[in-house]
Amino acid sequence: WASPAKVEGNGQGRGNSGVYLLGKYEVQILDSFDNKTYFDGQAASIYKQYPPLVNACRKPGEWQTYDIIFNAPRIEKDGKLARPGFITVLHNGVLVQNHSELQGGTFYDRPPEYKAHPEKGAIDIQFHGNPVQFKNIWVREFKELLPPEKAKVANKLKELDRKSTRL
């Protein structure tokens, strides 16, 4: 993404946009180069939850990159949270969100909260009234890795299953 080279506006009025995951969890897009704004509204913040670890913004007009790794929350059919969501973000190759635990949806006007939703869904680009360009958007699905203790059990079960099918 890139904000315009000619700087107009300040704070949240400069290159304001966002990447929405499942329509509920926003990674903020903002021209944060020499631009003061609230800490959890900067570029690469998890909006209204976590500021970036560092400001990795390039100058206005230069292309920025985000690598976003999203582990969707798991919400039971009864609406109870089974597992929170997590987001990792690299901004221009710099780690700025390190497996940050989502507190719920990212809202500008109320505290975060989880509400039931599908485990898979849309990735949306927010239009917030400011010009922002986008190119080369890629989406890849990663298989979920099991924690080491669960992986050992899963591997043992596979091994037992293979042995039981041999004649």
Indicate residue ranges for each PLM-predicted region.
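Carbohydrate-interacting regions of secretory-pathway proteins
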Residues: 1-166
